[in-house]
Amino acid sequence: MKAILALEDGTLFHGHTFTGEGSAGGEVIFNTGMTGYQEVLTDPSYTGQMVCMTYPHVGNYGINPEDIESAHIRVAGFIVKECCKEPSNWRSTMTLPEYLTSQGITGIEGIDTRALTRHLRLHGAMRGYISTDVSDPQRVVGLAKGLPSMEGLGLADRVCCDAPFTWSGTAMEPAKIVDGTYAWPGTGPRLVVFDMGIKWNILRLLTAQGFDMLVVPYTTTAEQVRKLGPDAVFLSPGPGDPAALTDLVHTTSLLVNEYPLAGICLGHQLLGLALGGRTFKLKFGHHGLNHPVKDLQTGRIEISSQNHGFCVDIESLSDVELTHVNLNDNTLEGFAHKKKPVIAIQYHPEAAPGPHDSRYFFSRFRNLVRKETGK
């Protein structure tokens, strides 16, 4: 079935759908990873975005239940050069088209993804719309123009939990209530995790560090956190513009004075804002598995997994030590507060997908909590 991808600037890409009749709209970005499409599809940080995979052949190892990063597909639409309909992998339980179709996600193939990527790289990420109704392309352009801009858009409410939950090691479980309050499930150092779109591999790696976790909605107040009695606080990744989450920025500005804190991606940006910094939108973002980052504390070069469209302005921060920098564009990738037990990185140490060069971040946070609390 014929399909069209229309960008807000009027650029058109003609292809065909591999998910049947449908439509989708969102910010169009590109991901340079050669593998990991299943993790990309289920990463909550891609909410509101249509992802173009630059690798030309996608879907060859199918879909399996082990490699998902959340309960649902999160991308608004999926764009590939060629979709494999006959995967070959011993873990595969369904094809990529079957997976997308089962959750009502529109996919388009047969377009020149290299040309699309170059266009986005030159002109920046922009709104786009996929439609199988190709009779009036300018109407589809109009639909793209009518979509909200990612700047100023808060999307955490679309992906966060409704109520606190715990992590069993393999699955989410509703937090138990004992004597009128949420009960901690174990005996390790208590960690409140703010959910703005948490990835499951982050929960796995925090569990591996021995943390006893309660994952809470991002709307949880500082007073509610205090009543839970944690030893530390963690801010998750998530989608959208961090500056739109004004209440959470305020909450974070209070918590940094009371607990050891760590943040990843959106959590990193929120900590930057809470400490008086500014954020800005990148031209086309960092989305891929091979971004070089330098750890300024050790001099070590890491190959990192990244997925963000916003960044903290280096010049806007005070009382912090810059710990990581991107070697492609010299943007900020991590910082630590000079006086408070606060650390944050912009990229994804949990990978999923991607290299494991940066997984030390979780043990670094664990050591920070141990130093501050004795636990």
Curated annotation (Swiss-Prot):
Enzyme class: ligase
Binding residues for L-glutamine: S45, G238, G240, L266, Q269, N307, G309, F310
BP GO annotations: 'de novo' pyrimidine nucleobase biosynthetic process; 'de novo' UMP biosynthetic process; glutamine metabolic process; L-arginine biosynthetic process
Glutamine amidotransferase type-1 domain span: 190-375
UniProt catalytic activity: hydrogencarbonate + L-glutamine + 2 ATP + H2O = carbamoyl phosphate + L-glutamate + 2 ADP + phosphate + 2 H(+)
Region described as CPSase: spans on this chain: 1-186
Pathway named in the protein's UniProt entry: Amino-acid biosynthesis; L-arginine biosynthesis; carbamoyl phosphate from bicarbonate: step 1/1; Pyrimidine metabolism; UMP biosynthesis via de novo pathway; (S)-dihydroorotate from bicarbonate: step 1/3
Active site positions, chain numbering: C265 (nucleophile), H348, E350
Listed Pfam families: CPSase_sm_chain, GATase
Entry keywords, A to Z: Amino-acid biosynthesis, Arginine biosynthesis, ATP-binding, Glutamine amidotransferase, Ligase, Nucleotide-binding, Pyrimidine biosynthesis
EC number: 6.3.5.5
Entry's Gene Ontology molecular function annotations: ATP binding; carbamoyl-phosphate synthase (glutamine-hydrolyzing) activity; glutaminase activity
Top-level taxonomic group: Bacteria
PROSITE patterns named in the record: GATASE_TYPE_1 (PS51273)
Quaternary structure (record): Composed of two chains; the small (or glutamine) chain promotes the hydrolysis of glutamine to ammonia, which is used by the large (or ammonia) chain to synthesize carbamoyl phosphate. Tetramer of heterodimers (alpha,beta)4.
Family according to the record: Belongs to the CarA family.
Function as written in the Swiss-Prot or TrEMBL entry: Small subunit of the glutamine-dependent carbamoyl phosphate synthetase (CPSase). CPSase catalyzes the formation of carbamoyl phosphate from the ammonia moiety of glutamine, carbonate, and phosphate donated by ATP, constituting the first step of 2 biosynthetic pathways, one leading to arginine and/or urea and the other to pyrimidine nucleotides. The small subunit (glutamine amidotransferase) binds and cleaves glutamine to supply the large subunit with the substrate ammonia.
Annotated HAMAP family: CPSase_S_chain (MF_01209)
Protein name: Carbamoyl phosphate synthase small chain
